[in-house]
Amino acid sequence: MFKFNDDKGQLKCSFCGKSQEQVRKLVAGPGVYICDECIELCNEIVQEELGTEEEIDMKEIPKPVEIRKILDDYVIGQDMAKKSLSVAVYNHYKRINSGAKIEDVELQKSNIMLIGPTGSGKTLLAQTLARILNVPFAIADATSLTEAGYVGEDVENILLKLIQAADYDVEKAEKGIIYIDEIDKVARKSENPSITRDVSGEGVQQALLKILEGTVASVPPQGGRKHPHQEFIQIDTSNILFICGGAFDGVEQIIKRRLGKKVIGFGADFGDGVKGDLKAGEYLKYILPEDLLKFGLIPEFVGRLPVLATLEPLDEETLVRILTEPKNSLVKQYQKLLSLDGVELEFDNGALLQIAKEAIKRNTGARGLRAIIEQIMLDMMYELPSREDVNKCVITEETVRDKVKPQLLTKEGQELHEETA
């Protein structure tokens, strides 16, 4: 350590050795001095070590309209779901900032249930919301959960994932978002309560009730099962937003029966303005909590998820828009990858439509688009880095449908003729 003064009696920083004239400010302590530059450096080191706590300020929470606009940049279609989520999320964080009480009125949590087919954007919506709000986010799979005391994961392990996402900052994690996927898989096998143990169905729903509503949970820091001789992380779940998602295959039949199965005549009215000639996927928008009870969720569980948002199956037009429009769309990602090798990539309209048709045929929704494009692009991504004569690669409808090689063009625009793949 440097002396705080030299032989001439000039004051110096005890850490870096700079004199009083060389710095803006020198702060005195008992027998030591520290300059403003060293204070700033120490502050940066402490912040890196401990992490900066980011309080969610009401002024910083985007309004529902703003949340919706940002969701539009990443998620195509699903307008009603985006509207419902924007309002629910805004109200949730407004509730946190108000201290959950306004003039002695207690504001209840508004956890969300997302219902829609595979690949319709449930997980992406939840991820994007967490990114917009800059809060910790964790995804859990309901199929891996079991009731306490049985082989499988305890529900508290869901909270551990959130704590890990917050770098073990519990206070930050307490304002995070947890997405529980495949929640329909924990429905009990029949509408009537079971006399036997249903450890991966009704038992899991019962175990989730407390953390959904809000409780101080004890979480094992290393995950796994609890045992008496270990320390626990205490986390209050009152302000954690839970979003549960599932495809709920078969619930449309339940809705259809409720609306009135025996309607005679094309275009007949079910009542309440609901037409009888609805297509598959269109019944979901008329879902009610009672339909979820018939599906196999217990009343207490449905009650903890008051916001119901449904997602529509994706048609060809929407899938084409998903391929091209979002900020991080698949087409833009692959164009960027090839541009790093000096090759321009183009998908013609026929190719995009054919990719969308293939995804619908596979019944994978938007989730299957990457696998299809990866299959199409594999040979090109293998060959093109070594091809200095290629300036542009065009994926055509024939490339997707008939496995024909893409069009390869030189800088002069001349086509390089390739053999069929």
Curated annotation (Swiss-Prot):
- Give binding positions for ATP: P117, T118, G119, S120, G121, K122, T123, L124
Asked if Zinc is a keyword of the record, the answer is yes
Domain of life here? Bacteria
Single GO term (MF): protein dimerization activity
Pfam families named among the record's database cross-references: AAA_2, ClpB_D2-small, zf-C4_ClpX
Q: Fetch the PROSITE patterns from UniProt.
A: CLPX_ZB
Give the CC-aspect GO terms. Answer: HslUV protease complex
Q: Per the record's keyword annotation, is Chaperone included, yes or no?
A: yes
Any Gene Ontology biological process? cell division
Amino acids binding Zn(2+): C13, C16, C35, C38
> What positions does the domain ClpX-type ZB occupy?
1-54
Which key words are in the record? Answer: ATP-binding, Chaperone, Metal-binding, Nucleotide-binding, Zinc
List, alphabetically, the SMART domains matched.
AAA (SM00382), ClpB_D2-small (SM01086), zf-C4_ClpX (SM00994)
Q: Which family does it belong to?
A: Belongs to the ClpX chaperone family.
Name the PANTHER family on file: ATP-DEPENDENT CLP PROTEASE ATP-BINDING SUBUNIT CLPX-LIKE, MITOCHONDRIAL, ATP-DEPENDENT CLP PROTEASE ATP-BINDING SUBUNIT CLPX-LIKE, MITOCHONDRIAL-RELATED
The record's listing under NCBIfam families reads: clpX, PRK05342.1
Q: How does it assemble?
A: Component of the ClpX-ClpP complex. Forms a hexameric ring that, in the presence of ATP, binds to fourteen ClpP subunits assembled into a disk-like structure with a central cavity, resembling the structure of eukaryotic proteasomes.
Relate the protein's function as given in its record. Answer: ATP-dependent specificity component of the Clp protease. It directs the protease to specific substrates. Can perform chaperone functions in the absence of ClpP.
Mind telling me what this protein is named? ATP-dependent Clp protease ATP-binding subunit ClpX
User: Source organism lineage?
Assistant: Bacteria, Bacillati, Bacillota, Bacilli, Bacillales
